[in-house]
Amino acid sequence: RAMHFFGDNARVAAQVASLREGRFEDFLNMIKASGDSSFKYLQNVYSVKNLSRQEMAVGLALSDVILKGKGVSRVHGGGFAGTIQAFVPNDIVDIYKKNMEDIFGEDACHVLKIRKYGGMKVL
């Protein structure tokens, strides 16, 4: 757990710098690295109460196949077989969603959009 924790703390600083400097591909690569670290070192893509359930690992592998390096995915949230967060280019969102729902069922994939201005401070 410590390997992931300290590695991810370093990645966060690098992610912030990459976004400030307009290096979005570097940001995505660090998102992928963080997710891979979470998978390997936290082993949080499955529940220890039900090891036969491998949907998260399958979903991450399927994401790699669909995205073919054009986007990234990672385990996200509380872990323990929770959610996949995927950064998918607009031109393949429909393909990604269809493929994921063909495997995991209708409404398994939710498309979110980030507004142009991102987060803002509210006084």
Provide a role label for each language-model segment.
Residues 1-74, 85-123:
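C-terminal nucleotide
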